[in-house]
From Swiss-Prot:
Keyword Magnesium: yes
Topological type in the membrane: Multi-pass membrane protein
GO aspect biological process, one term: glycerophospholipid biosynthetic process
Protein name in the entry: Digeranylgeranylglyceryl phosphate synthase
GO terms, molecular function: geranylgeranylglycerol-phosphate geranylgeranyltransferase activity; magnesium ion binding
A Pfam match: UbiA
InterPro entries in the cross-refs: DGGGP_synth, Prenyltransferase_related, UbiA_prenyltransferase, UbiA_sf
Annotated catalysed reactions: sn-3-O-(geranylgeranyl)glycerol 1-phosphate + (2E,6E,10E)-geranylgeranyl diphosphate = 2,3-bis-O-(geranylgeranyl)-sn-glycerol 1-phosphate + diphosphate
Function: Prenyltransferase that catalyzes the transfer of the geranylgeranyl moiety of geranylgeranyl diphosphate (GGPP) to the C2 hydroxyl of (S)-3-O-geranylgeranylglyceryl phosphate (GGGP). This reaction is the second ether-bond-formation step in the biosynthesis of archaeal membrane lipids.
Chief location: membrane
PANTHER family in UniProt: CHLOROPHYLL SYNTHASE, CHLOROPHYLL SYNTHASE, CHLOROPLASTIC
Pathway connected to this protein: Membrane lipid metabolism; glycerophospholipid metabolism
UniProt family annotation: Belongs to the UbiA prenyltransferase family. DGGGP synthase subfamily.
Length: 277
């Protein structure tokens, strides 16, 4: 076993980002600064949900990763599959305990979200579009969790809508990117069933819907700090048009959408803190 494999399988950079998004969701909803204890708990509950889900996903994706990502910890033999499963369950348990110290709604929400991350890797991921929507919903749940942690939703609801739409687009692009490995293993992802071109059209539609949804907060008086959302919209439009022109651009497109998502969260935060300005 490799010690570094236990860190790598968590994908800590993604989990740290998710934890930060959870905190930002709390800040956006609170329209101010909650106490540090609450923000710390939100960060770690989101972190362990993300890391547990990533670990479980690698457990279930072992055969696919041997083709698509042979350098991942399990395919290269950094740890056994059984160890990965127990490790995922341990992370879920730690996150659930921490969630209990926030409030009962935060505990219930986290428990449901954790179960969905496990169910996704176990059963939902191979289902065309269903798997994509599940991942997008879990991503959108991150800022909402932060909002629940501070006891209010506020602008975090609009952030969740945008996060859901853009991540459906991104997940479809990722399926287009992985189409060869998925075909080799007999997977039935959306691009395999309806073709790369039609899948690209659906991905682009969700991208354009995100741009439209990004204007919703303006109606409720979000602050001037929200202005950088224009840059986000430009990035999303570019990624959507590129994949429409050539589905092979999906790899670059999904990375652009990941960047756009983070910039959007910052824009929502700045808008919430400058509300009324």
């Amino acid at each position: 076993m490799e010690v570094k494999g236990f860190i790598e399988i968590m994908r800590p950079h993604n989990c740290i980002l998710a934890g930060i998004v959870g905190i930002l969701g709390a800040l956006v909803a609170y329209e101010g600064i909650p106490d540090i204890k609450t923000l710390t708990l939100i960060f770690w509950v989101v972190y362990f949900g993300c890391s547990g889900g990533n670990t479980a996903n690698d457990y279930f994706d072992y055969e696919i990763d041997k083709i698509n990502r042979p350098n991942r910890p399990l395919p290269r033999g950094a740890m056994s599959r059984r160890a990965a499963l127990y490790y995922a369950l341990l992370q879920y348990a730690i996150g659930s305990i921490l969630a209990y110290f926030l409030n009962i709604r935060a505990f219930v929400f986290a428990t449901i979200a954790y179960f969905l991350t496990f169910l996704y890797g176990w059963k939902l991921k191979p289902l065309p579009l269903v798997g994509n929507i599940t991942v997008a919903a879990l991503t959108a749940a991150t800022p909402i969790y932060g909002a629940i942690g501070v006891g209010r939703i506020g602008l975090a609801g609009y952030l969740a809508i945008c996060a859901f739409l853009v991540n459906v687009s991104r997940e479809i692009m990722k399926d287009i990117e992985d189409i060869e490995g998925d075909k080799a293993l007999g997977a039935r992802t959306l691009p395999i069933i309806i073709g790369e071109k039609k899948a690209a059209i659906i991905a682009a539609i969700f991208g354009f819907l995100t741009v439209i949804a990004s204007f919703l907060p303006v109606k409720v008086g979000i602050g001037l700090g929200y202005a950088p959302i224009i840059i986000v919209d430009i990035i999303i439009i570019k990624a959507s048009i590129d994949v429409l022109r050539d589905p092979k651009a999906a790899s670059k497109g999904q990375k652009l959408l990941k960047i756009a998502t983070f910039v959007a969260v910052i824009s929502f935060l700045a808008g919430a803190l400058t509300k009324g300005v």
